[in-house]
Amino acid sequence: MLKVIQLDKTYGSNKHSLKAVNFTAKPGEVTAIIGPSGAGKTTILRSINQLIRDDSGQILLDDTDIRQANKAELRKVRHHIGMIFQNYNLISPLTALENVLHGRLGAKSTVAGMLGLYSSAEKQEALQLLDEVGLKEYAYQRCDQLSGGQQQRVGIARALMQHPKMILCDEPIASLDPKSTTIVMDILRRLAKEKQLIILINLHQVDIAMAYTDHIVGINSGAIVFEGATNEVDDAVLQHIYRQPDQSTAVAANEN
């Protein structure tokens, strides 16, 4: 389980990006973070894997406080946290298979990683993961020859190659057409259930969050204003999450 406790982040002249953020995300569930642009959604994800350093709080993955990890410990923790990006973050001239294999780099020595030394078992696993996302037939095709939706599925397979406990998805469908969006979200939901993964996803599309996720975290101006099961979200909750800063803040964040 992921537990974020009293997470605070300040930029510049005491401008709060995150204000005492608290929420949980469970294995086997897709948890969506929703809220207005600039509310702090991406900052939360980047704080979880410490791509940016927050100011205070706790980030517990199982019993490990990621914030307290030293450099060597953080490298090990990150190996169990997959990341899926809006812009795919693939090495375009390489094949789909080669990109998926890069998911094992965190488990290899620097020399083995630089030389691209992968075992036959790792190559078979990468092929199996491409099959799981419906791309086995494209294994030896360059990624810059794939569609955006196909590239995002390669990114999912690469994240799975890390043997993760959790996958962080930063606006993974923002650049996709409706058909590709459906395919990607179906895959993420299936993987959460089958592999008992924590899937934490930032979304601007409320309809997609309502259709594909189990748990909703609503953020506004850096503060969590709602947390609960997706089926608890109604129009009043959405209006509260997406309210303008000067509007009433009468609804308290759900503790579930």
From Swiss-Prot:
- Identify the enzyme class: translocase
Q: Name one GO cellular component term.
A: plasma membrane
Q: Which residues cross the membrane?
A: none
* The keyword Cell membrane is annotated on this UniProt entry: yes
MF (Gene Ontology): ABC-type phosphonate transporter activity; ATP binding; ATP hydrolysis activity
Q: Which of UniProt's keywords are assigned here? A: ATP-binding, Cell membrane, Membrane, Nucleotide-binding, Phosphonate transport, Translocase, Transport
Reaction equations catalysed: phosphonate(out) + ATP + H2O = phosphonate(in) + ADP + phosphate + H(+)
UniProt signal peptide: none
Q: Which InterPro entries match?
A: AAA+_ATPase, ABC_transporter-like_ATP-bd, ABC_transporter-like_CS, ABC_transpr_PhnC, MetN_ABC_transporter-like, P-loop_NTPase
Instruction: Cite the record's note on assembly.
Output: The complex is composed of two ATP-binding proteins (PhnC), two transmembrane proteins (PhnE) and a solute-binding protein (PhnD).
NCBIfam families assigned: ABC_phnC
Q: What name is this protein filed under?
A: Phosphonates import ATP-binding protein PhnC
Organism name: Lactiplantibacillus plantarum (strain ATCC BAA-793 / NCIMB 8826 / WCFS1) (Lactobacillus plantarum)
Query: Highest lineage ranks of the organism?
Result: Bacteria, Bacillati, Bacillota, Bacilli, Lactobacillales
- This protein's encoding gene: phnC
